[in-house]
Amino acid sequence: MKILIFGLTGFGKTTFAKQLTADTDIPHFNADEIRGMFKDWDFSSTGRIRQVTRMIDLCTIANKTCVVDFVCPYNLYRKDYDITVWMNTIESGRFEDTNKIFEKPTHVDYEIKDYNYDKIIKEIQNRLQ
């Protein structure tokens, strides 16, 4: 099962993902860490698509339930995940170029509007058992 935690920069994606995977053996792939490993800080359209592909490929290679957290700005690429969590906690992100291209989701499994999300974490963890 592939779980996507997405939203604009600074919305709490990594914090949510870390809490979701705490005390488990579920791999957590963070976009900034993955970009650092590949030394790929290209945020052009091509670079963003390459990163989207890289993140889904990591889940495929892991061959088990995994969690990824990244902006994932395009609806087209969110459909590759079994569970989607939209971190919709603040009005806009830190980077105006990303704010402009970010497509509001057409469908999500969970929308997080504040930082009181323990119930949703428990619900997802129960789905994984």
Q: What do the predicted segments below correspond to?
A:
Residues 14:
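Walker A/P-loop
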Residues 32, 87-88, 113-116:
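Residues at the C-termini of beta-strands that transition into short coil/loop
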Residues 2-4, 27, 65-67:
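Residue-level preference for the first positions of well-ordered beta-strands
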Residues 8-9:
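The conserved Walker
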Residues 59-109:
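ATP-dependent NMP and nucleoside kinases share a basic, alpha-helical "lid"
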Residues 48-56, 78, 105, 109, ...:
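Amphipathic alpha-helical transducer elements in NTP-driven molecular machines
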Residues 3, 19, 23, 83, ...:
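NTP-dependent small-molecule kinase module
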Residues 17-60:
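Conserved substrate/cofactor phosphate-moiety recognition/catalytic segment
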